[in-house]
Structures are given as C-alpha cells and as structure tokens.
Amino acid sequence: MFIVVEGGEGAGKTQFIQALSKRLIEEGREIVTTREPGGCSLGDSVRGLLLDPEQKISPYAELLLFLAARAQHIQEKIIPALKSGKTVISDRFHDSTIVYQGIAGGLGESFVTNLCYHVVGDKPFLPDITFLLDIPAREGLLRKARQKHLDKFEQKPQIFHQSVREGFLALAEKAPDRYKVLDALLPTEASVDQALLQIRALI
C-alpha cells in the first residue's frame, strides 16, 4: 500500500507519520517512511538546493528539479518497497508540486499535473490513499515561526500559504475516493485513529 501525507506548513505531517507508522508496525505491517524532496541520494541532494532561501532558481527550473527527484525516488525506493510487500508512507508527493508550483506558484494546475502524472511513464503513479492534514494558513505559520530556521517555502507570505491550503482542499474535493481530509488542529493520535479506519477499509 502506498500512503501519502500532504498539508501546508506547520500541519504536523512529520509527527503524524511517526505516530501512524508506529501504529501500523504494531499491527504487523512492514513500513517504509520517506519524504519529498528526498528519499534517495539524488533527492536529498536536490532538496538542499530547492529549500535554500539563498538559491535563486527560476520557477520552471524549480519544477523540473522536483520532478527529477521524484522520478528517481519512485524508481529507486517506492516501487521496490511496494513490490516487496511493504507499506510506503511518503511525506509529500505529486499534489504538493501541483499545489505549490502549479496553483500557488502560478505555473498552472493542469500543466504541472500533466508533468507529474507522466514523470515515470504514460500512466500516472498515484498513491492508494492521501491524507491531507488541513490547517489554517495563519495557524500553520505561527507554529513554524517557533523554529529557528525557515526554508524558502516557509518564508513565503501568508497569502501564498492561503493559496496552498485552498489548492489542497480543491484537489481533495476532486478526488474524494483517494483523499481523506483530517483536521490538523486535533491531537495527533485522534487524526491517526481516523486514518487507521480509512486504511483498514482499503485492506
């Protein structure tokens, strides 16, 4: 099973994934957790470039770097893990690119979606289920402000992050069978309980 966790800045994805993984392992599943950009040596190298506020990368170059990292990530890590019977949980995937670069970034939703869906061939490589940790942009940014160092995207203005939130919710509305929206203001364990119900329904 391939699970993706999406959400805006400060939604608590890392904590949610850790808690969800722990519960699934307790149920006897083999879990592989990963993230984007990252998840492989190429992805980790690209991550540093993409998130560095000092790097001046054009929007199209940024998009293609995300896609290059994803293509390698899918082939090197995700597909082999799935073929071996493991459950893969990824912190971000296609929809983050569609929202951050396509919608909030202005490159166009349909244009970016088309590129994402053809990154490893003619057929879209999609998760079995996507959990969206939804949080108001202002609250998410307040959480992030407590950190010492913010990356390039975390430093963007609130209007950008509001567009990100609206973009994710719009994608969730278009794909209700794949998307499950969780309230990121709830305690993590409450969200994990809801997620486990959805995962068990797919088994």
From Swiss-Prot:
Catalytic activity: dTMP + ATP = dTDP + ADP
Residues given in the record as ATP binding sites: G7, G8, E9, G10, A11, G12, K13, T14
GO CC annotation: cytosol
Protein name: Thymidylate kinase
InterPro entries noted in UniProt: P-loop_NTPase, Thymidylate_kin-like_dom, Thymidylate_kin_CS, Thymidylate_kinase
GO molecular function, one term: ATP binding
Record family assignment: Belongs to the thymidylate kinase family.
Keyword terms: ATP-binding, Kinase, Nucleotide biosynthesis, Nucleotide-binding, Transferase
Task performed by this protein: Phosphorylation of dTMP to form dTDP in both de novo and salvage pathways of dTTP synthesis.
Repeat in keyword set: no
A single BP term in Gene Ontology: dUDP biosynthetic process
Gene3D superfamilies attached to this UniProt entry: P-loop containing nucleotide triphosphate hydrolases
UniProt keyword Kinase present: yes
Family matches, as CDD domains: TMPK
